[in-house]
Design a protein with these regions (language model features):
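Short, C-terminally biased terminal segments at protein or domain edges
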Residues: 1-49, 53-115
Length: 115
């Protein structure tokens, strides 16, 4: 159940990130939008890849990579908000999604490790 929720949330998050990046029109923002797009879409890609992991170790590794990418995504979101490249509603929505995914990833990693 939690895995399906994580898969669904990570896909919704990736869509939100792609739409956010496509909507940024401020010149000289491409270095930030490129980083945000890479980190933000990598979260879901790693979660999806974990579903077909070759081992428990591989499964945990993919989830931990997704966790790191979600943390990086939060950084880029905050930087884009603080530099006025995205509005408060966009920032709050995407950051909340990211935070919720991160919580599920932490719980999933702990469960997988038997903690």
């Amino acid at each position: 159940m939690a895995e399906n929720k994580l898969l669904e949330m990570s896909f919704e998050f990736a869509v939100a990130i792609v739409n956010l990046v496509d909507g940024v029109t401020i010149p000289k923002s491409s270095y930030m939008t490129d980083q945000l797009a890479r980190a933000g879409t990598s979260v879901g890609a790693n979660i999806h890849e974990a579903q077909y992991a070759q081992s428990k170790k591989d499964f945990i590794s993919k989830l931990e990579i997704a966790l790191k990418e979600s943390n990086e995504t939060s950084y880029w979101l905050k930087l884009m908000y603080e530099t006025k490249r995205i509005d408060v509603q966009t920032y709050q929505y995407t950051e909340k999604l990211c935070r919720n995914i991160r919580r599920l990833l932490i719980a999933s990693c702990k469960t997988a490790k038997g903690m």
